[in-house]
């Protein structure tokens, strides 16, 4: 390990640790609200959840600067724009479901950044694998955020999802449910496993993607249909200066955040589908979802041929905070508690 990599590595770990401990402590401080007013407690947790969206956006900005080109279907032309500083601004439905193809372990950070551009970063609910819930501090915090941890055992996941969806239906605030239907990131072994399954059920295998898993998304939509407006579909493609066949081989978490391996460009194409128009029968939904994935595959074909996804306009930006001082908001709860404690101490002493 070179000196440069060592400095980057321990700087990243320090920033992540300080930020995570601060956010988790802020969550715990608000616990008494749960026993006083649950709606107020949920709003408080959303407030602390926004800190996490800011933290992870800042970590990408600082340790893995990522140029982004965003395109969208023509009917969405008025929902995306750049502010005077070149930061992306997004107008999203107040209650929505977000799906995306899964290329990297860090994909969820980019989806959270997109939620940040829509001012919904405090209202995301992400589906993650069950093992992550036990990560010290980070996992505990995500449990308080009510993220949905899945074991890939349907009987158990069915109960977990049902419990969380009951909560989400009753939330009076914004909601953005985020999931990756492919279930894992794209590498040679997962692609071949998906190919075997495609051959088994007799469907066409995409060239650049894995087949999406149907059951979880179908159940999510069926349970939330009456409380959600739109489903947003993000197609991600990470340009690799190498290039390697699979982005995950080039851009592992250590390579991105410790070694500083640069992502040449992240291409994102956004589509939107009214929840009310998505099929309600599982067989029809399966066909519908596979068709969306074949369309995503063609979008990537177009990008590889022309250098860009199709769209009426291309927005060029970077993953970053709108204002660097936003990172200080992470400490707002602790600062308030410290100041209040000092005033209380002075009051008692006099």
Curated annotation (Swiss-Prot):
One of its GO terms (biological process) is phosphatidylinositol acyl-chain remodeling. Coiled coil: none annotated. Its EC number is 2.3.-.-. Keywords: Acyltransferase, Endoplasmic reticulum, Membrane, Transferase, Transmembrane, Transmembrane helix. Disulfide bonds: none annotated. The keyword Acyltransferase applies. It is found in: Endoplasmic reticulum membrane. It is a multi-pass membrane protein. It comes from the Eukaryota. InterPro entries: Acyltransf_C, Plipid/glycerol_acylTrfase. GO terms for cellular component: cytoplasm; endomembrane system; endoplasmic reticulum; endoplasmic reticulum membrane. The chain crosses the membrane at residues 10-30, 51-71, 327-347. One of its GO terms (molecular function) is acylglycerol O-acyltransferase activity. The keyword Membrane applies. Belongs to the 1-acyl-sn-glycerol-3-phosphate acyltransferase family. This is Uncharacterized acyltransferase C428.14. It comes from Schizosaccharomyces pombe (strain 972 / ATCC 24843).
């Amino acid at each position: 390990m070179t000196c440069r990599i060592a400095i980057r590595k321990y700087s990243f770990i320090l920033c992540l640790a300080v930020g995570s401990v601060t956010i988790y402590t802020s969550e715990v401080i608000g616990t008494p609200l749960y026993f006083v007013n649950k709606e107020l407690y949920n709003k408080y947790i959303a407030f602390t959840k926004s800190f996490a969206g800011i933290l992870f956006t800042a970590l990408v900005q600082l340790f893995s600067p990522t140029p982004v080109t965003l395109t969208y279907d023509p009917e969405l032309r008025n929902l995306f724009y750049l502010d005077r500083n070149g930061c992306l601004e997004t107008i999203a439905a107040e209650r929505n479901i977000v799906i995306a193809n899964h290329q990297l372990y860090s994909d969820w950070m980019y989806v959270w950044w997109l939620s940040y551009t829509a001012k919904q970063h405090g209202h995301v609910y992400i589906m993650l694998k069950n093992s992550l819930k036990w990560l010290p501090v980070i996992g505990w915090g995500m449990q308080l955020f009510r993220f949905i941890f899945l074991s890939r055992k349907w009987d158990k996941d069915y109960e977990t999802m049902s419990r969380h969806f009951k909560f989400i239906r009753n939330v009076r605030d914004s909601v953005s449910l985020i999931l990756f239907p492919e279930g894992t990131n794209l590498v040679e072994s997962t692609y071949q496993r998906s190919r075997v399954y495609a051959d088994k059920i007799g469907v066409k295998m995409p060239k650049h993607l894995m087949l999406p898993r149907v059951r979880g998304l179908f159940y999510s939509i069926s349970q939330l249909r009456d409380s959600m407006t739109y489903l947003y579909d993000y197609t991600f493609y990470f340009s690799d200066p190498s290039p390697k066949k699979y982005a995950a081989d080039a851009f592992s978490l250590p390579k991105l955040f410790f070694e500083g391996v640069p992502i040449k460009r992240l291409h994102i194409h956004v589509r939107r589908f009214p929840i009310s128009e998505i099929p309600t029968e599982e067989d029809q939904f399966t066909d519908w979802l596979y068709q969306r994935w074949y369309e995503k595959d063609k979008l990537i074909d177009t990008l590889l041929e022309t250098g860009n996804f199709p769209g009426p306009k291309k927005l060029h930006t970077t993953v970053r905070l709108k204002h660097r001082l936003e990172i200080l908001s992470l400490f707002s709860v602790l600062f308030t508690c410290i100041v209040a404690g000092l005033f209380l101490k002075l009051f008692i002493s006099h």
